[in-house]
Amino acid sequence: MVLRRLLAALLHSPQLVERLSESRPIRRAAQLTAFALLQAQLRGQDAARRLQDLAAGPVGSLCRRAERFRDAFTQELRRGLRGRSGPPPGSQRGPGANI
């Protein structure tokens, strides 16, 4: 509790904040933070641009991609169901089913 108050008092001191901001480790940490934020922003803009280009492309290619995804998904689902032993879930009727 005392340590918390001491740190709060020190961090609210303009002279200490000024001296810390001039120190090499704090400046380096600020540079790295700014670099990381800028890189994240640029990557986000690039991803948004690629999505816009994809959406603005021919509708036929988007439909083909959706069909390929649907076909691959149904194939994997069927393969997975074939690999299971026993009745499919929900096929039993009556009390005590699927216990």
UniProtKB/Swiss-Prot annotation:
Q: List the disulfide bonds.
A: none
InterPro entries found in the cross-reference section: NCBP2-AS2
Q: Which domain of life is it from?
A: Eukaryota
Q: Where is this region: Disordered?
A: 76-99
GO cellular component term of the entry, any: mitochondrion
Coiled coil residues, start to end: none
User: Any further remarks?
Assistant: Induced by hypoxia in cancer-associated fibroblasts and promotes tumor angiogenesis by causing increased secretion of VEGFA which leads to endothelial sprouting.
- PANTHER family noted in UniProt: PROTEIN NCBP2AS2 (PTHR41161:SF1)
Q: What is this protein called?
A: Protein NCBP2AS2
The organism is Homo sapiens
Gene that specifies this protein: NCBP2AS2
